Design a protein with these regions (language model features):
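Short aromatic-enriched loop/helix-cap "lid" or pocket-rim segments at secondary-structure transitions
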Residues: 1-4, 50, 73-77, 139
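Catalytic metal-binding/acid-base residues of hydrolase active sites
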Residues: 44, 67, 131
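Phosphate-handling substructures
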Residues: 11, 54-110
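Active-site-adjacent alpha-helix immediately C-terminal to a catalytic or transition-state-stabilizing loop
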Residues: 47, 55, 110-163
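Short beta-strand scaffold positions
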Residues: 40-41, 107, 127-128
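Active-site-proximal alpha-helix that buttresses catalytic centers in soluble enzyme cores
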Residues: 1-59, 100
Length: 163
């Protein structure tokens, strides 16, 4: 893949991505971890991954709009290592031109996690994006700006968090 900022851009799974999703579904089923429901981002790359997991596990799956990736505005589709973007992403409170700020993203995800935390009788599998994973990690762990910037997960990585 091209190492460009996808954000809200429609970017379907590649064949490799579909294979990873099928393998993840098998791994989730084999893990023995109790899961009640899959919640997934409305973006097709996450939705297709969630459907592959649901097919392998038999778990119900529901679209959760708050799990959509951050909107990077004018930076959508540009190289991740672009100088202007690298500087902009260090300004957490500033909204990307035509997009949303890191603070807005964090509020959206923290509100969702607070709701899931209050639903104590259920366990959820979230299928989303690396930017969302970073915010989820910051919900559970204290992080410096540097640790936050370096945080994330691999494609189709299965990570468990407990409230």
């Amino acid at each position: 893949v091209e190492n460009k900022i996808c954000g809200m851009t429609v970017s379907p799974l590649t064949e490799r991505g579909r294979q990873q999703a099928r393998k993840l579904g098998e791994a989730v089923k084999a893990s023995g971890v109790h899961i009640d429901e899959i919640l997934y981002s409305p973006l097709s790359r996450a939705a297709d991954t969630a459907m592959a997991i649901a097919k392998a596990t038999g778990l119900p799956a529901r679209c959760e709009p708050r799990l959509r990736e951050q909107c990077f505005g004018k930076y959508e589709g540009t190289p991740r290592n672009g100088g202007e973007f690298r500087v902009s992403k260090t300004h957490f409170a500033d909204r990307y031109s035509g997009g949303e700020s890191m603070m807005q993203l964090a509020q959206r995800i923290y509100n969702l996690l607070d709701e899931l935390r209050a639903d104590t009788d259920k366990t959820y599998l979230l299928v989303a994006h690396n930017g969302i994973a970073r915010v989820v990690q910051s919900y559970f762990y204290d992080m410096t700006n540097e640790k936050y910037a370096a945080a994330g997960i691999k494609n189709c990585e299965f990570v468990e968090f407990t409230f």
